[in-house]
Each structure stands twice: as C-alpha cells, then as structure tokens.
Amino acid sequence: VFKNLKKYYLLTAILFFFNFIFAQQNNVALTPPMGWNSYNCYGSAVHEDEVKANADFMAKNLKQFGWQYIVVDFLWAYDNPPGSTVGNPFQSRLPDGSYIPWLRMDQYGRLLPDANKFPSSFGGKGFKLLADYIHSLGLKFGIHVMRGIPRQAVWAKSPVLGTNGITANMIADTSSICPWLNHMYGLDMQKPGAQEYLNSILKLYASWGVDFIKVDDIARPYRSPEIEGYYKAIQNCGRSIALSLSPGETPIRDSAHVKKYANMWRMADDFWDNWEQLLKMFDYSKTWEGVGGPGHWPDFDMMQIGKLSKRGPVGPERYSRFTPDELLTHMSFWCIYRSPLMLGGNLPENRDIENNLITNDEVLAVNQNGLNPKQLYKNDSSMVWVSSMHGSKDMYVGLFNIGVDAHQVNLDLAKLGINGKVTVRDLWKKSDVGIFKKKYSKLINAHGCALLRIKVN
C-alpha cells in the first residue's frame, strides 16, 4: 500500500546520510542556524548596549527553543554620526589620497570595532569582551564582513601579517569594488599574501570568539576564489566558525561549489516586509529545491518580524508591515523550507504576536527536524510544500493561500504516497484536527497558511 511512501523515506534517508557525512568537514550548521541579526532594525548603527539587550532577551526567552546566534551586521568599524540613518556611507579621498571617513583598523590592515559604538573594544580589545558576554549567556556570536581588504589599508601599504615584506597594495584587486559600499577592494587570490591576509583576519576573529561570519558582496556576482579563501582561512583559524554568503541571488549553476565551501548563502536580494517580495521567495525556493542539507543551507534572508528600521536602513521605524496571516506564512514557509532563521526585529520590543511566532516548538521542529522539503504543487492561488521528518514516518505539510481571496486549499494524500487513514495535527494550534482519508482540505484566508503534521495510522 505504501510502496511510493517507502521509496520516499529511503531516498530522504540516503540523502540525509551523505549530507550529514559531508557536513562533518566543519561540524557547524548541521541544522539551519537560528538567531538574530542587527541589520533590519539598526542598519549600520547598532551599539553595544543594544546588542546586549537583544542577547539578554534571547537568553531569557528564546534560547530554550533553539535560538542561539547574535550577529552584529555591517559597518561596526565606522563611527556613525549621532542620529544618522545613512545605510551605506561612501568613503571619499583627501588630496593626499587618504580616505574619509577613516575606519578603525590595526597595523595589519584588519578592521576593528569602533570604540564609540562598542566601548568594550577600547584599547584594541576588538569584540572579545562582547563575545565573552554573549557566550556567558549560552549563546553564539557573529559578525558581518565586507569581502576583501580595506582601501585605506591599500593606501597605507599595511603589512600583511604572516608574510615577509608583502603589503596590502600588493594583494588587492583595485578593479574590484562593491558598487553599494566602496570601503573595500577585492583580493587577487593568485597573489602571494592574499590567503595569508584572510588567514590573519580569521585568526583575529577566532581570538575574539567569533562563531559566525556573514561575508557580503561575495555571492552576487559569485566570487569562487575568494569564497574558497575564506573557507580555507576558517579551516586554519583554530575555531569552528559558520560561513554565510551575501547578497543574493547566488547563481544556481554554482550550487555544487557553494555547498562545498559555505554553510549558508542567499537565494535572493534583500528581503523586506512586502507581500510581493514574499511571493518571489516561493519562486526562488523551487529553484533551490533539494540543495539544502546538514552544513549547507539556501538562505531566504533575515526575517521581517517585530520592530524594524529603528535606525534605517529601509523605510520609517515600524513594526513589520506583514498582516497576521502573512506573518504566519512568512514563518511557516521559512520553517518548512528549512531556511536559516535569523530574526530581524528588535527583540526587546516584541509583542505577544511576535513572541508567539518564534516560540512554538512544534513549528520550529519543522525547520530543525524536517528532511528533503519539496513543492507538491503550486498554481495562481494555492501552494503546498511537504517535508519528511527525521526519525519518524510522519510528514510535515504546509498549505499556502497565495491568492487574493479566502478559499479551500486541498491536499491529495495519494500524492504523498498515502492510501490509508491519517491523523492531521495543526502545528500552530498544537492540536489534532481529526482523522482523514484520501484528502484533507482547509479554508485559508488570503495570504494565510496552515502548517500540519501528517501521521499515517
């Protein structure tokens, strides 16, 4: 009766085994990383006390549900003017060729946290004390990194640590500049000293206690030599560090490469609290279907849940513009697809609606314990995704109304390889709906969803 279902279980078990063995190379991100990132609420201007406040909230309210990473996003080396909400402040040059604003940097061309924003870094301590604080809460610490080497280090001809006489100007690719933040040059990885520079910054981050780095301006366009350089530097730094690549969209043609060298990578450009952008994520998800697994995860981007844009970078300060139904769809789809879950809102300002979204253990289990998610069908008004479940014959199913009106979304159990009776459980309500045979149907609001667990009786 269940031949097709048995084949599906066997295939997912085989895929899980080989993905798990592959992931042991760095033993990080064996399940999709779960955490918080400062960008969506603080842009380039987060301060140390705000990072600590979010860490405190996570440790008290979220850690027991699996949330663990606290990530400081970009421009931590830049002294933002008070009240500034400028997202990407460009550097300009003085008559002698030097750069303004000048970023905090050590003698080896390695950026350091700005002490005005991160007072514990004063005296060259870097992020060590902040990381220690976050680790003391039982959490992990991450930072954002722009690809390459600071242009000001190239101008200053900063020596590259670990080399004999090689300076920053000898390893930079001065034709490679990020179009939306001009602080860095790319690295020419064929030049002697380029890998040593990456080795030096990763050893610095490891000495601080960094557990996660998000490298930006590296996945679009896809820069395989530099990606391999960061990977090698992590392998040699003496600490387990997860590697995240940004921005999207990462080319699907490079899926084999990115699976080998990164732990997560962006499928799309920046995602914000807009239904049209959420619809596009459904298309990206189909493109990357079947690629994710232990140690390597396609990433939808940070989650638009909670208080956003307190200091930029997009739109006025606000709670997420998503409706309650859209928030359920947002959270449910990130979970069933097994995308990394990085919260973007300011956690201490969460209301009940936000806390209920991110503390449902049965919903989070779909993200952490699912296997081989795949799209069952999609049309103009409905979409259904299914995931098997590690250690069980049960299945997870997401029913999504992507149309403009409330309507019934149908699940044909035969398409799951099931011909007998099933028990359907509503994961958001944490309650069994009933026993069904052949099909299950639910009336769902426009832009809403149902997240289910299907148990074969």
Feature locations, PLM:
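Bacterial Sec-dependent N-terminal signal peptides
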Residues: 1-24
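Structural recognition of the beta-strand scaffold that forms the well-ordered cores
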Residues: 32-38, 68-73, 140-145, 206, ...
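Aromatic-lined carbohydrate-binding/catalytic grooves of carbohydrate-active enzymes
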Residues: 59-133, 137-206, 210-212, 217, ...
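Glycan-recognition surfaces
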Residues: 170-176, 189-190, 196, 240-346
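Carbohydrate-binding surface patches
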Residues: 328, 334-337, 342-344, 378-418
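Catalytic cores of secreted or luminal carbohydrate-active enzymes
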Residues: 329-377
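Solvent-exposed beta-hairpin/edge-strand motifs
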Residues: 414-429
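C-terminal beta-strand-rich structural cap/linker in extracellular carbohydrate-active enzymes
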Residues: 435-457
